[in-house]
Amino acid sequence: MEWNGLKMIISTMEPQVSNGPTSNTSNGPSSNSRNCPSPMQTGAATDDSKTNLIVNYLPQNMTQEEFRSLFGSIGEIESCKLVRDKITGTQFEEHFKDLATGTKWKPLTEEGPIFGKGQSLGYGFVNYIDPKDAEKAINTLNGLRLQTKTIKVSYARPSSASIRDANLYVSGLPKTMTQKELEQLFSQYGRIITSRILVDQVTGVSRGVGFIRFDKRIEAEEAIKGLNGQKPSGAAEPITVKFANNPSQKTSQALLSQLYQSPNRRYPGPLHHQAQRFRLDNLLNMAYGVKRFSPITIDGMTSLVGMNIPGHTGTGWCIFVYNLSPDSDESVLWQLFGPFGAVNNVKVIRDFNTNKCKGFGFVTMTNYDEAAMAIASLNGYRLGDRVLQVSFKTNKTHKS
């Protein structure tokens, strides 16, 4: 990756007014993601959270030096860390809570976090000396296009009960409703962090299902009170607005078992795909919500404690993709799974002698709900002359 002259480019760059592309196929945050206001404006941030930033959707091949160079062009940095796969070189879990709650980085000693040369997980943290530089970094770099990614820069919010479980699931939306109209409908109840309308990956037509994440749970509660059972403009039926379920709930585990485990087949392949897709969509509509704010939030991590669901690893949810063509490479997997949410890493398994794809690969996604939705949408998807088989990775899945 070439970064020469980057500082000069950044210094002349106009502040970004959008957090990402408007296309539904972009590999990065959706365009509805808000520019995070200054903590001085909201009055809700602590002193520490005025300088700590989380950066999502970074190119996988971006180095620590490039990451520091990019954000160092804004102002003096106290610490800057690109998070890497702990299995391939990084140990950060013991120190994660210090970062997420806005406290200062621990020194890089033998007892501190080791940021080695493992595979990048696509996100990192920056802690500035001056809060004004942190604010400038958000205004300048949020929405910046790097390779195929559009990065998202926001304050690393402290863990608090008031900001947990603020995700809403909305169904029964008019098929003609746009993302902007969805936001306009809900914005009267509070600050929207992210929103999303699910579309059919083949036709591009809305599925009538959307997700809204508010800044605070109380705002989400007010939206449920005000809009659940109401008919928005253009709707033939009342919409349903409810909290997106936590994947650790028993109902979700039971539904997941129905979705992805079959006594007769090793993989949930494309047979009777249209009927299966209808069943998958209905089950997912009952159980799952998409979390789009951050790849690592305290509530997101604690919700995974004690779970025993196929595909869960220490770095996210591993998805097995089968029946890829010999010419497939990692970019194919990025393009397929990127629109569904935060992708930590992708890997195409290649033949040692020919370096051609052996027909399968793996994708690790940060959020369970996004991974489940990607599987439901892409299992049975026709890619060229092949029909993909997509499922959560299990112990019986092909070894890499």
Swiss-Prot record:
This is ELAV-like protein 4. RNA-binding protein that is involved in the post-transcriptional regulation of mRNAs. Plays a role in the regulation of mRNA stability, alternative splicing and translation. Binds to AU-rich element (ARE) sequences in the 3' untranslated region (3'UTR) of target mRNAs. Mainly plays a role in neuron-specific RNA processing. SUPFAM superfamilies: RNA-binding domain, RBD. It comes from Xenopus tropicalis. Residues 18-33 have a biased composition (Low complexity). GO terms for molecular function: RNA binding. CDD domains: RRM2_HuD, RRM3_HuD. Residues 51-158, 166-246, 317-395 form the RRM domain. Residues 34-44 have a biased composition (Polar residues).
